[in-house]
């Protein structure tokens, strides 16, 4: 039996039907339980399918889903972990989301923080909004305001444009249409979403159709889930078949052999789904583990996670695809996110574009915000309000400026131009930045040039750092190569010039001698004359021309001998 996924916010509807599993202002401890719900108290759930805590402390270990609101939550090896207005710590969890609080995710697949601090270590995706984020060895992704096209990228996210993700691990689109195929997670906001064979599909403010997806949730619309792990519908009718749990609230619901299906004031149909949630929208989920649409149209087929909010999303076999108020197309993508922009991600793990154009090919992460981005074979590329070109770079971020990153691990530019080549980390804010093979370069309101630097920071000034964190006097490999190349070219040019100069000068001298000393006959050597040899054979003297195999003619030598005689 699969662990539940997707019962994040609307699982509180279970309080109306599962009073036996509910504690108010008390402490609850559940082991190997299908569902555990606590309101205003402490909860400890171990190996449970779902654990929900409101205004209290929750600790979930190896649980399918753990949700905490206005409290502290600690989740270990959990599939889903969400915390609102509190502190969250997730270890080895697939999803960790924190809103208005602090989140620490270690080895988690996805970690999202809104209006708070986030620390992600070895996490597949970490996205902070309006807060501080520290990500180490994270796969990640995030972009705003532009069009994105990601191909074979690790993560693709697009905001305020259309997004198309193919074979990407996660695809997310906001304010546009999204189409995700074979992606791990697909999320669409404020448009229609179609997810096929995706791990998770979520749609807000629209219709959703999910097939063979692990988790599907729809808000403000009708939902139909088939063979999905979790199906939840709010504000509509729900029909769940072969699902583990089905709970409808203020609507019609039909659940058959379903693990979990919740419907609240909406229409939902779930068949063989583990978790499917629909809230005030239309959702159709088939064989999906988790799919959530909210106020939009979403179609997810065999998708693990697909989310659509007020936009169109089509996810097929995608792990994660998210679209919000934009168009997104994700195919076999692990993560692709588009928000109010156009995004095309193909086989990309993470690609993010917001209100700009982005093209990512085989990139781990590509993010574009209000600008144009082109990422090829890059793990992470982020552009915000500027143009970015990333090639085989792990992370490249540009905000309101132009960025060109090549084979760089991390490059970030904000309101300036950035060129990063083979650099581990390069960050520029309101200035120009050029980082080459640098470990870390940060520039704020100024221009910075970093080459192979361990750490370079500039604030409101111009800075140039070369080979920081390296022994004094050491040169960058490309500098050594350039110097050597220039030296070789100069030496070859010098020798070639000398050769031709000497050769031309000797050739002109020989021609001059032949023209001046004109021959006077064939028998000139036998006639009398001053300095003559009177018929004796004349041995020509040594001449520099012999060095060039241009011997002086005998006539010229004889004339020279006559002139030199008494």
From Swiss-Prot:
Segments on the Extracellular face: 25-479
Paired cysteines (S-S): none
Localization: Cell membrane
Primary subcellular site in the record, as a coarse category: membrane
Region (28 X 15 AA approximate tandem repeats): 31-435
Cytoplasmic compartment segments: 501-566
Region (Cytoplasmic tail), start-end ranges: 521-566
Membrane topology: Single-pass type I membrane protein
UniProt note on tissues of expression: Expressed in lung, large intestine, thymus, and testis. Expressed in normal and malignant bronchial epithelial cells.
Positions bearing carbohydrate: 25
Alphabetically ordered keywords of this record: Cell membrane, Glycoprotein, Membrane, Repeat, Signal, Transmembrane, Transmembrane helix
GO biological process, one term: negative regulation of cell-cell adhesion
One CC-aspect GO term: Golgi lumen
Further comment: Could be considered as a marker for lung carcinomas.
Protein's name in the database: Mucin-21
Originating organism: Homo sapiens (Human)
Lineage per the UniProt record: Eukaryota, Metazoa, Chordata, Craniata, Vertebrata
Gene name of the encoded protein: MUC21
């Amino acid at each position: 039996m699969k662990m539940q996924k997707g019962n994040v916010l609307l699982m509180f509807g279970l309080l109306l039907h599962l009073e036996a599993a509910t504690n108010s202002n008390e402490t609850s401890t559940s082991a190997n339980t299908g569902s555990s719900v606590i309101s205003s108290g402490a909860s400890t759930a171990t190996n449970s399918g779902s654990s929900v805590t409101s205004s209290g402390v929750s600790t979930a270990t190896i649980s399918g889903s753990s949700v905490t609101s206005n409290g502290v939550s600690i989740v270990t090896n959990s599939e889903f972990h969400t915390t609102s207005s509190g502190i969250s710590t997730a270890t080895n969890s697939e999803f960790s989301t924190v809103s208005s609080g602090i989140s620490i995710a270690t080895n988690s697949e996805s970690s999202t923080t809104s209006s708070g601090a986030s620390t992600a270590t070895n996490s597949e995706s970490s996205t902070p909004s309006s807060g501080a984020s520290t990500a180490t060895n994270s796969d990640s992704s995030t972009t705003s305001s532009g069009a994105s096209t990601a191909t074979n990228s690790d993560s693709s996210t697009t905001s305020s444009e259309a997004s198309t993700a193919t074979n990407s691990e996660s695809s997310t689109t906001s304010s546009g249409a999204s189409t995700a195929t074979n992606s791990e997670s697909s999320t669409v906001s404020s448009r229609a979403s179609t997810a096929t064979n995706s791990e998770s599909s979520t749609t807000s403010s629209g219709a959703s159709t999910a097939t063979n997806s692990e988790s599907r949730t729809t808000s403000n619309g009708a939902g139909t889930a088939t063979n999905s792990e979790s199906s939840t519908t709010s504000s509509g009718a729900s029909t769940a078949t072969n699902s583990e749990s089905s709970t409808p609230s203020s609507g019609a619901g039909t659940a058959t052999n379903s693990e979990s299906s919740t419907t609240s004031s909406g229409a939902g149909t779930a068949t063989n789904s583990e978790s499917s949630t629909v809230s005030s929208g239309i959702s159709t989920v088939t064989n999906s583990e988790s799919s959530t649409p909210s106020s939009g149209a979403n179609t997810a087929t065999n998708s693990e996670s697909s989310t659509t909010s007020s936009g169109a999303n089509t996810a097929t076999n995608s792990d994660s695809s998210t679209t919000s108020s934009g168009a997104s197309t994700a195919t076999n993508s692990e993560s692709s996110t588009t928000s109010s922009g156009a995004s095309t991600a193909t086989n990309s793990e993470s690609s993010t574009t917001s209100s700009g154009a982005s093209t990512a090919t085989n990139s781990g992460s590509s993010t574009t915000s209000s600008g144009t981005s082109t990422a090829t074979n890059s793990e992470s590329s982020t552009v915000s309000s500027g143009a970015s070109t990333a090639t085989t770079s792990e992370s490249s971020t540009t905000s309101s400026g132009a960025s060109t990153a090549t084979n760089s691990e991390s490059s970030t530019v904000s309101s300036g131009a950035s060129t990063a080549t083979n650099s581990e980390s390069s960050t520029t804010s309101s200035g120009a930045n050029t980082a080459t093979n640098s470990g870390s370069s940060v520039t704020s309101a100024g221009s910075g040039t970093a080459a192979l630097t361990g750490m370079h920071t500039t604030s409101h000034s111009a800075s140039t750092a070369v080979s920081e964190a390296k022994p004094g006097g050491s040169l960058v490999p490309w500098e050594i190569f350039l110097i050597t190349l220039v030296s070789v070219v100069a030496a070859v040019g010098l020798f070639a010039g000398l050769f031709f100069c000497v050769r031309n000068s000797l050739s002109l001298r020989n021609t001059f001698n032949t023209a001046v000393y004109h021959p006077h006959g064939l028998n000139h050597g036998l006639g009398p004359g001053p300095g003559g040899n009177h018929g004796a054979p004349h041995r020509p003297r040594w001449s520099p021309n012999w060095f060039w195999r241009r011997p002086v003619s005998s006539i010229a030598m004889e004339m020279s001998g006559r002139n030199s005689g008494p």
